[in-house]
């Protein structure tokens, strides 16, 4: 069976109601995601290679299960990984990395906080029409590329506030990671904890377990980057 098909099941995980069928493509994509985050915590530029694999495979998954808005977000994360790879690879004349791990200056931190609060508020109110719009855009693009796709039937979001938090904070965290700001890890911790709870409430315990692992990786990343920033003289919320 085709490796890229979500019907190509690697293993049935007997967790939750009915268990969970883990496909090969999801398993490989998940492993790539774990490697990406683990390497990022070590400040290894190779994290972006695995990040590209992760978002590409999950983009294919979202295409197959007709989550076209999520597919479009993977396009953003793909571009962010490319930019992050470039930004992290830049060096000074002394052949040192141009970007250093540091905290956001207070004015920037407050600006990003305002962006997050306003964006989450707006997304909570308009998440259904926003995802409908993103889905239509994705369908139009794919149809223009010659793919035989139709507009899927969309269901109202079951957790509009929490899904808005995860979407907005994921975008902001990815942007901050490409610039080596410590705060990205704090956001990933929040995102992962929310994901653990949401997937558990939906009965998808295998995914909830995966995000528990991601939470511990993000906590370790926070610890390591905070120590690295301290060694470089960077302090949280400094001017």
Swiss-Prot record:
Induction: Repressed by NadR. Keywords: Cell inner membrane, Cell membrane, Membrane, NAD, Transmembrane, Transmembrane helix, Transport. Beta-nicotinamide D-riboside binds at residues 188, 192. It holds the Pfam family NMN_transporter. It comes from the Bacteria. Signal peptide: none annotated. The keyword Ribonucleoprotein does not apply. The chain crosses the membrane at residues 22-42, 49-68, 72-89, 110-127, 158-177, 184-206. NCBIfam families: NMN_trans_PnuC, PRK15397.1. This is Nicotinamide riboside transporter PnuC. The lineage of its organism: Bacteria, Pseudomonadati, Pseudomonadota, Gammaproteobacteria, Enterobacterales. The gene is pnuC.
């Amino acid at each position: 069976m085709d490796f890229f098909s979500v019907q190509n099941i690697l293993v049935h995980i007997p967790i939750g109601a009915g268990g969970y069928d883990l496909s090969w493509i999801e398993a490989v994509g998940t492993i790539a995601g774990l490697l990406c985050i683990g390497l990022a915590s070590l400040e290894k530029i190779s994290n972006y290679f695995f990040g590209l694999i992760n978002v590409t495979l999950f983009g294919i998954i979202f295409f197959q299960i007709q989550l076209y808005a999520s597919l479009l977000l993977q396009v953003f994360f793909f571009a962010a990984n490319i930019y992050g790879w470039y930004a992290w690879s830049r060096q000074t004349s002394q052949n040192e990395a141009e970007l250093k791990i540091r905290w956001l200056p207070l004015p920037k931190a407050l600006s990003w906080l305002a962006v997050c609060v306003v964006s989450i508020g707006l997304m909570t109110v308009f998440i259904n029409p926003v995802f409908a719009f993103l889905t239509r855009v994705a369908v139009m693009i794919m149809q223009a590329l010659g793919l035989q796709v139709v507009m899927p039937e969309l269901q109202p979001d079951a957790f509009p506030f929490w899904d808005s938090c995860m979407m907005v904070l994921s975008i902001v965290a990815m942007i901050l990671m490409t610039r080596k700001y410590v705060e990205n890890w704090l956001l990933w911790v929040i995102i992962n904890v929310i994901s653990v709870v949401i997937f558990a409430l939906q009965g998808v315990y295998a995914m909830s377990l995966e995000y528990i692992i991601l939470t511990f990786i993000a906590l370790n990343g926070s610890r390591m980057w905070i120590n690295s920033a301290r060694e470089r003289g960077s302090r949280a919320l400094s001017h």
